[in-house]
Each structure stands twice: as structure tokens, then as C-alpha cells.
């Protein structure tokens, strides 16, 4: 497994917090953590930080669908003409063609950005210069925003007369490819055993390109090793500690760390501390039914002291429908695809 480097090919790799390809522009710092070379599709991931008052002006992507997750600080976002005050844990769905821009309101602002379907991730190298530091520069240099154009799928939009009243963050995501903001811990919550899964973005929001979900739980056993033929999984540790097996070895992830698991890579994870929480992006999004077979609806916001039954039997029943090869499981050899071994 590659560590603290982007391998420029489809291979498993792990990045410690702050590692990646860093570009500075003005008092902004963009750290690329994944590119089309690694993802084998037009997509990119980046960590965005900046000084208080640092702004990314209104713009839109013609082809790139963007998802934002607030990691730290307070950010004001303009989304489709409406202002939102974002705080840690908020999630933003930005379909292609949606006008948006943001400003950091304190010195600790940090956003996670994933773009799928276009080359908007190239905008950071266009705007900035390679940068050795791991914190944003204290710079008053003017940024030449005019370098952004359709060649990096990022076109500036003249500021309009949008409303000043703060828009309300949602508690449940709508259906379809529409822009929206979910408040922290909100979304479609489900539970499997003692782990709570919260779907932030389902496949309807991106026309099947990806899903985004939070997972949290206490110390527990490792899930069985498995792999996918076409599915890529992107893991961001937010809290606690998780041990991941990917490819040919184990790696521990701590808050801020990232792991890329491409198709045909045997992998597994285990939560090693109580209240561990991680954010995952899964592409393509047609793997979503797996979580609906595995989980049952859940009204709570934290994992329960007495968990409900773990319904892996339902996954086994529907194995033939899923891009999933189970390499090990407790109590017997891997089941054959499409063959049920337990009753519903």
C-alpha cells in the first residue's frame, strides 16, 4: 500500500492528515487527496482551508457534481442564491450547474470537497502554486480569478441580488438532483448491530454517480474481508481510531487521515475506540442497496447501548444483486454469489 503519496494509478493508498498535493493561492490552501489518475474517472478530492475572510467567489461547474463536508470552523455558503451558515458536520450537495461560493468566517475553516463527473479539481493548480507548508499562508496577495474557465470546469458568476436571510438546513435529504444543505448529524439514519449509518447523499442526488454516508460506533469486531469488482470506497476518519485492512496489510486511521480503496482490493475495517466516526464516499452509487439490506431504519442520533440484531443474513440473500465478494465471514466459508444461507 502506498503511504503519504498519490500513486498516479488505481491502487490503495493512505494519507495522514495534511498530506497530499498542496497548492496555495492568496490565503487559501487546497490539498488534493485524489485525482482522476487514482480514481480512474473524472473526479477529485481536496481539503480546503483559508484565513478568516478568505473567499471563493460565486462560480459553477458545468459537468462536475460537488459534495462539501464541513470539517472545522464556520463558513458562510451561497448556494443557488441562498445564504447558509455552515458549521462542522454540515453536508452540502451541489449538482452541476449550481451557482455557489463560500467565505471562511474564522481562522479554523476547513472543508472537504469531492467533485465527480468533471475536472473541476484542476482549478486549484490553475489558481495557485505548489506549496510545502501544511497550513494556509498568511498572504495578502491578490488572486487572479480570471484564470478560471471552462477548461477546468469552473466559471465565475457575477454576484446577483440573492437574499440576506439565512436559509434553513434540512434534517432529511430530498430526492433527486437538487442542491441542499443537511445539518450536522442529520440525514437518513439506519443501524446495523451497534453501528449507525447516516446517508447524507443517496444515488438519486448524483444520478447514481456516488453516495455519501457517515458511520459511527463503539469498539467492535472487524467486518469480514471483502472486495468489489467496480466499486471504489473513500474513507475519512473524523473521530476515534479505525484499523483498516486494504490490499496487503493493515493501517490505522486517526482523525484527518484518508484511505483510498479501489476496485478488486480486499479490505475490511474495525473500530478501535468508542465513538469512532468516519465519512465514506462510495462510487458508483448503485452499491446503495447493500446498506439498505444490512441496516434497519433508526430514529436515534447515537448508537444504542443495546443494539438490534445484526441482519447480515439479508445481505447474503441478495448477494447476487451486489458488487460484493465476501472473502471471509464468521462461522463458515465464503458464500456463493446469489445463494442464500439464512432466512430473512
Please place each PLM-identified region on the residue numbering.
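Jelly-roll (double-stranded beta-helix
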Residues: 1-28, 32-43, 55-65, 74-210, ...
